[in-house]
Amino acid sequence: MKRFKRVSAVVLGFALLFSPLAPQTVAEAKVVWGNQELVKGQIGRVTVLKNTNLYNIKNNKLVAARKVTKGQVFRVYSESSKFGGLYGVSKGTYAQKSSSIKYEKAPRDKIQALGVTVTKKSLASNTSYPQVSGLINKPFEASYNRKFLNIAKEAQKEHNELKEQEKEDRKNGWAPGPYSRNMTYSVPYNQDNILSVAVTNDAYAGGVHGNAWIDTYNYDLLKARQISLKDIINNNTKLNKVNNYIRNEMIARNKKGAQFWVNEFKSVNVKDDQFYYTSSGIAIIFGEYEYGPYSNGIHTFKIPSSVYK
């Protein structure tokens, strides 16, 4: 039987306060295309080459809405073949395809840099997982989705095994509470063609308390590859700076009531430690019993990029 224990609601709540599942304010991606910022939902732009009109559609007819002059540029959010070709520049307002305008489709990598679509899927109420769409690299998109589906299937399999074990334990007079294995996720970073997913797990199979842990997955969507912490902290100088930053942060948190065993912290493990991207750098996660008692829970240390660059 797998070594699962019950997660205390209080401790897990404290742990998640510092985890990727805690409410976060993530800055919107800023993507510049030429001299104009690309925005969510934009598919292209039209440049006015000669003075012309923008149009509305009324009673299935094009009606001039306002005049536009040479040099003006408008974001395009939709494209239609009606009336010889229309480009939606705002709600109900269109530029008509003609020699008076030039249409340019936004580069796919620029659109992807604004953030891909992540959809929540569930195998059961206790197991949810992410599926992505909108990636340029479709084989990679399919591979990504299979990976997280398989992770979810394994979690649900473990849950089902625990429920069977619970039945056996109850027959033998031992089952202090419902056994379970839960999985959910958050997306702490989704911009600049980087996607970070944090999978939060907890499990209980009897005992005083259970286990909670976070697995993170970070991807370079343009290169279609997973990013490791070693890719970011790639030399001893950077590693020493990050270690010093975390050590000082532990000391500061201890003054506010945390119980980090600062002397036991020697270094970040760039091969195994979990991390995710933030708008200002990265965040490194330490699990239960890492550098502190169980009551410390799961802790996240946000490292500004200025520390390791």
Predicted regions and their residues:
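Sec-dependent N-terminal signal peptides of Gram-positive bacterial secreted proteins and lipoproteins
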Residues: 1-28
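Compositionally biased intrinsically disordered regions enriched in Thr/Gly
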Residues: 4-5, 108-309
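Hydrophobic pocket-lining residues within nucleotide cofactor-binding pockets
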Residues: 16, 94, 132
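Surface-exposed loop/turn and secondary-structure junction residues enriched for glycine/proline
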Residues: 24, 57-58, 97-98, 135, ...
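Beta-loop motif signature
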Residues: 28-110
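Sequence-level motif detector for i,i+2 pairs with an aromatic at +2
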Residues: 24, 41-43, 49, 84, ...
